[in-house]
């Protein structure tokens, strides 16, 4: 089974926030951890706290082309942004965009016309766009309808917030957006949204089942956001899906754990078989 993590962060600077461990998480460290967990490859989402993270992502994908690909970010309000979008796929390992509008100076992009020029260019490029967060998701329905050939990926279960008592708060329309064939969902970061739970995080199982019923296994992508998981090992994040969800068929698991993502992003890594995973 090809196992591709739909989201990790790699960085070599020291700007990381506490919930990501603060110290750098390098490509070499990730490869060793992936081998131990039985993970073949991963999509790196360069962290926005590090202004130089796209550079490190390109370097990492160049050194390990069968282990890492990248959904990079860019400042859409810069004059050079349209040309960068047009040339995005020419960068080694760059297979998509990730737009969250999380910074204060980005929050107007969905309504000030910025996304109106970006999305047609992204659609023309053929590269998927990962969208997430409370400033972006309210506009997904409009964008999915306006740009039927744009592959949209919802970040982290379609999350718009998180609280200690409610855990994961999804956008209320996440399930209904499944009617758009160009919308998919990353099942990433789950254990971090179940901090009061423990492996196998049964509080998440019903959410996963509802997304499965809505989207099917062809539009769901397993992932971890591993540097944020303090209550779960990488191997446990794998086995939660491969061993603890009995309603998934073997074909479902093959799709959700990597095959569906490979098709959606048109990325076919061919890594050597990872080392045998350690017991969880």
Pin down the residues of each PLM region.
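Hydrophobic faces of well-ordered beta-strands that scaffold small-molecule active sites
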Residues: 3-8, 42-44, 70-72, 95-99, ...
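Conserved, mostly hydrophobic/aromatic
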Residues: 7, 34, 57, 97, ...
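Catalytic metal-binding/acid-base residues of hydrolase active sites
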Residues: 9, 48, 158, 190-191, ...
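Glycine-rich phosphate-binding "P-loop"
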Residues: 12-24, 45, 95-110
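Active-site gating/metal-coordination segments in enzymes
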Residues: 51-135, 142-144, 186, 190, ...
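Alpha-helical scaffold segments that flank or form the walls of functional sites
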Residues: 19-45, 53-63, 86
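Catalytic pocket-lining loop regions of alpha/beta-barrel enzymes
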Residues: 108-221, 269-280
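Mid-to-C-terminal alpha-helical segments outside catalytic/metal-binding sites
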Residues: 1-6, 23-41, 210, 214-221, ...
């Amino acid at each position: 089974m090809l196992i591709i993590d739909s989201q990790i962060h790699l960085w070599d600077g020291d700007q990381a926030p506490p919930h990501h461990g603060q110290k750098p998480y390098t490509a070499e460290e990730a490869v060793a951890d992936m081998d131990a967990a039985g993970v073949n490859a991963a999509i790196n989402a360069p962290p926005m706290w590090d202004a130089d993270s796209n550079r490190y992502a390109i370097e990492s994908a160049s050194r390990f082309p069968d282990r890492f690909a990248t959904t990079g970010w860019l400042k859409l309000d810069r004059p050079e942004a349209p040309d960068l979008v047009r040339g995005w796929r020419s960068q080694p390992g760059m297979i998509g965009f990730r737009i969250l509008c999380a910074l204060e100076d980005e929050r107007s992009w969905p309504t000030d016309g910025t996304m109106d020029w970006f999305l047609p260019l992204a659609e023309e490029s053929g590269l998927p766009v990962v969208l997430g967060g409370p400033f972006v998701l309210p506009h997904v329905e409009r964008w999915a309808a306006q740009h039927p050939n744009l592959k949209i990926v919802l970040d982290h279960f379609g999350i718009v917030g998180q609280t200690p008592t409610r855990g994961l708060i999804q956008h209320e329309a996440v399930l209904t957006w499944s009617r758009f064939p160009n919308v998919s969902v990353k099942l990433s970061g789950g254990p971090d949204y179940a901090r009061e739970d423990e492996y196998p995080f049964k509080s998440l199982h019903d959410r996963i089942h509802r997304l499965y019923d809505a989207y099917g296994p062809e539009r769901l992508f397993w992932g971890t956001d591993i540097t944020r998981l303090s209550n779960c090992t990488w191997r446990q994040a794998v086995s939660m899906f491969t061993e603890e969800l009995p309603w998934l068929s073997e074909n479902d698991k093959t799709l959700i754990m990597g095959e569906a993502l490979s098709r959606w992003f048109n990325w076919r890594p061919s890594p050597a078989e990872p080392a045998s995973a350690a017991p969880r």
